[in-house]
Design a protein with these regions (language model features):
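Transmembrane helical cores of multi-pass secondary ion antiporters/exchangers
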Residues: 1-423
Length: 423
């Protein structure tokens, strides 16, 4: 199957699942298409003993797509840019301490807690897996992906500050987690680890992260200058596309963080570019274009997550480890959210029940699956892929469908407390 045929088949499946969800089910788009793709995959597997070989061609499709490369080298830049474009930079700046601590300290705490407790699971199940892979799993599963839940949060009436915290954290901790994953992967590789010098990982992390932000500023400023020089929405859309695709490719060639570069460029264009370099007509067209790109790519991404079950070989021990990881991840998320908020409570106020909502709304998604699939073939890789997939399906399927209820309950508690004070 060539690229054109793959793209056509994948878009057709995505459109079909999106139509079925909108027409018959009515779930949030990304959650609905993922669950429909998952049901389709499970039915295809169940039909194999009866002679209906749907799972084979569908599995070939998933293999040919190469989920990790498709996301990390293709879709991720556009998704991050679209997300950054929608963020109100002034409000994000006002939440910089919260977002910064959640995306760094919170991510680090989650990685350590998940890694340590997962190592305990490895020992309890006598899996014989090296401890470094437990911490790799921690880095893989810790970044949040609230794309699927933001629309639900808005519908539930969550305050704007909490939306900004969710969005800002997810954008930056996705990018930072990828850098952390690369660093831990080098430690896990015995051929590389033996030659590593003290301080190398800190140097690598700093070069990737700071280099990515610096390069993103260059791309964003260059894009701003080009956008300000013309007033033609078709050309300006093309410029933003070039910033994403060309900028991401160049960042990879320069060995700096492509995700951080694109986020930085997207924030610059979304704030300064939209206000000072685009006419109102162009702003509407550019916003509509990137909103559409965001919706389409997210739908395709979550369909791929649902279909990925056809390509994963599950084992009993791996499934048990994956199920055990779910409460571990939730506990780690609770601590990773609680510590930064507790530190900052002396300096500012927070939305009531912020810890509860940020904990339960911290969904895991495609980034985690892609990172797990990018590991080199080994028993440890198969285990981590199993665990990651189970955790992601639970996160999107259970947390994604119940976060609005959690938000409403929190709001109801606040209303009840307020009425008691007035009586």
């Amino acid at each position: 199957m060539n690229v054109f045929e793959l793209t056509g088949l994948l878009l057709t499946l995505t459109a079909l699942f999106a139509w079925l969800n909108r027409r018959l089910i009515g779930l949030p788009s990304t959650v609905g298409v993922m669950l429909l793709a998952l049901v389709f995959s499970l039915l295809a597997l169940a039909a194999v003993p009866f002679g209906a070989n749907v799972a084979g061609p569908a599995g070939d499709l998933v293999s040919a797509v190469a989920f990790n490369r498709t996301l990390l080298d293709g879709m991720l830049g556009a998704l991050l840019f679209a997300g950054a474009m929608q963020v109100e930079a002034k409000k994000l700046f006002s939440e910089r301490l919260v977002v910064g601590l959640l995306a760094t300290l919170g991510l680090g705490l989650s990685t350590i807690i998940v890694g340590t407790l997962t190592w305990g699971v490895f020992i309890a199940l006598d899996l014989g897996i090296a401890p470094i892979y437990a911490y790799l799993f921690g880095a893989i599963i810790s970044p949040t992906d609230p794309v699927a839940v933001l629309a639900i949060l808005r519908r539930a009436g969550v305050p704007k500050t909490l939306e900004i915290q969710f969005t800002g954290e997810s954008l930056f901790n996705d990018a930072i987690a990828i850098v952390l994953f690369v660093a831990l992967s080098e430690v896990a590789d015995p051929n590389v680890a033996a030659s590593l010098e003290p301080g190398y990982l800190i140097q690598l992390f700093s070069a990737e992260a700071l280099g990515g932000i610096g390069f993103g500023l260059v791309v964003g400023l260059a894009g701003f200058v080009l956008l300000r020089g013309i007033d033609d929405y078709k050309t300006e859309v093309l410029i933003t596309l070039a910033m994403v695709i060309g900028g991401y490719a160049m960042a990879s060639a320069l060995h700096v963080s492509g995700p951080l570069a694109i986020i930085t460029a997207g924030l610059l264009v979304g704030h300064h570019g939209r206000d000072k370099a685009m006419s109102e007509h162009t702003r509407e067209r550019v916003d509509t274009f990137w909103e559409l790109i965001d919706e389409i790519l997210n739908a395709v991404l979550f369909v791929l997550i649902g279909l990925e079950v056809l390509h994963i070989s599950f084992s009993t021990h791996a499934v048990i480890a994956g199920l055990a990881a779910i409460p571990i991840i939730l506990v780690a998320r609770f601590i990773a959210v609680s510590v930064p908020i507790t530190i900052l409570r002396t300096r500012r106020s927070f939305t009531p029940h912020a810890i509860k909502i940020l904990t339960w709304g911290g969904l895991r998604g495609g980034i985690s699956v892609a990172l797990a699939l990018s590991l080199p073939d080994s028993d440890a890789r198969n285990l981590i892929v199993n665990m990651t997939y189970i955790a992601v399906i639970f996160s999107i399927g259970v947390q994604g469908l119940t976060i609005s209820r959690v938000a409403r309950l929190a709001r109801t508690d606040d209303d009840a407390a307020a009425s008691e004070k007035t009586t």
